[in-house]
A protein has these predicted regions:
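Conserved subregion of the PPM/PP2C metallophosphatase catalytic domain
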Residues: 1-34, 38-182
Length: 182
């Protein structure tokens, strides 16, 4: 983002009891204060061991009630079964790219502010599916045809390319990509 040295986005994974938890955070606002809150939320979530996405969002909301708040998306992938569970609040996006494309919906609200009860959505992943989480700093409606190597590049390369190709110049932009392998 132009004019800011740091931002309020965070994207990371956490190993939990039965798989991997993918996390995307977009703190309201920009700059140093937004960055500090994003780091605190990341530190909190890195200490968690549960893959219960609804419970984690609810606890995060309670723990950061007095903050400026954030949009947060949590994606739990059970490694043995390929079952994916997602819950999100605010302007976070999760998409699955595989034989077909699927987009799951985050609920309106702000973690730490006004938030309705999160809702969990589930998907069954197939071998090689790419799960892509991103913040509202990335153009929402890009299609796989705009990035034909989406399923063949490494997740790190895909995330970097999505931010560079589809990121908005005047907003923080973060992307997390995970490939499911049986």
């Amino acid at each position: 983002m132009f004019g800011e040295g740091v931002g309020g986005d965070a994207a990371f994974t956490v190993e939990v009891e039965s798989g991997v938890l993918g996390v995307i955070v977009d703190v309201l606002g920009h700059g140093e204060e937004a960055n500090k809150l994003a780091v605190r939320m990341q530190e909190y979530l890195l200490r968690q061991t549960s893959g219960d996405v609804v419970g984690l969002l609810s606890r995060l909301h309670e723990g950061f009630r007095s903050s400026r708040g954030a949009a947060v998306g949590l994606c739990m992938i059970e490694l043995a079964s390929g079952r994916m569970r997602y819950a999100g609040v605010g302007n976070t996006v999760i998409r699955r790219f595989g034989d077909s494309e699927t987009r799951l919906v985050s609920r309106d609200g702000v973690v730490g502010g006004t938030m309705r009860t999160p809702v969990e959505e589930t998907l069954q992943l197939s071998d090689g599916d790419m799960v892509v989480l991103y913040t509202d700093g990335v153009k929402t409606h890009f299609v796989a045809a705009e990035y034909p190597w989406l399923r063949t590049h490494s997740p790190c390369v895909v995330a970097t390319n999505i931010v560079h190709r589809f990121g908005k110049p005047h907003d923080d932009a973060s992307c997390l990509v995970m490939r499911y392998k049986r």
